[in-house]
Amino acid sequence: MTLDYDENKPLKAFVFKTVADPFVGKISMLKIVQGKLTAGVSAVNATTGETVRIGKLLKLTGKKQEEISEALAGDIAAVTKLEASTNDTLCAPEAVAALAPTEFPQACYFRAVNLAGGGDEGKLSGAIRRLLEEDPTLKYVHNHETHQRMIGGLGDQHLDVAAAKLKSKFGMEVKMSEPKIAYREAIRKPVTIESKYKKQSGGHGQYGHVKIEFESYDGDELMFCEKVFGGAVPKNFFPAVEKGLQEAAEHGSIGGFPVVRLKATLIDGSYHPVDSSEMAFKTAASMAFKDCMKEAQPYLLEPVDSLKILLPDDKQGDVMSVLSKRRGSVLGMNSVGGGMTELLAEAPEAELGDFALTLRQITQGLGEFTSEFARYDMLPPGTEIKS
């Protein structure tokens, strides 16, 4: 695409920065690449395909804001409350084509974030999302399993700046802590458990009786099967048994972590024509699961991440040594030129909390890495649980 900053050509403007102003709201800064941008007109966001209206158009000089009617090719201008994000391209309807976006580094250093004195976490989430609009290198996620809100950036200083902005712009003082790790539990030993739930009171009672084989398998989810013969347990109670097992498997016996790689086969049981109910069989299945976790030698699984590390050639040995101390392993390496190497590795997530800081220190700020979840592996005996 040829760009010559001709103000007579159709509009093309690039959103290169977004500022979250606590009083004005969102301010989008644009470079007019060609054509002219006029207040009050509509343009097409080439990135999203949506038509947006240009509201108040501003010229920024330091902290001074001057309202203007139009901006020409080559100018820098700002628009308030624009429905666009950093890296979006605004175009005239007759010439819609997005400009190449700026590539930002990915967040690699995460911390759990909460309001220091407690309070409305929803307001905190809203304030952080405002920061994300102006800083694409920040990331915000809610881990529903560990019940933590996490903010990610490029390092500790980056997150310190984000915390300072939350306080100065939105009046929110936050505290940050090490994230919890989402462990799993599994069993070593196959067991057969018989469980009976029987409760008698005035009127109808409760009766559910199950015999279940528990064993490990390769899948991540709980697998439920049935091999009941002769109608010992009526088919209409099978879903209740499965539901009882699934709910019980959400909390294991070691640390209350979800139980995975578990196959449960209902092989026998009994029922009462009057007292049996879905609730009774659900309860009996839950009791059987708890007994299983006592006898089947449960153990912990930890998440392992795949890493792509970019580092100077002469720092390979130092980084590999750090990975080894963090129970990591190197899978391979590729030369990418310019005196840099890409290192492919794996390491437990629990060992990567401050890896971004260590990598930056070793490589004098030249190293960077990305990570993604790979699988769950058995936690070595004696290893500290970070939860």
List PLM regions with ranges:
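Structural and coupling elements of P-loop NTPases
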Residues: 1-387
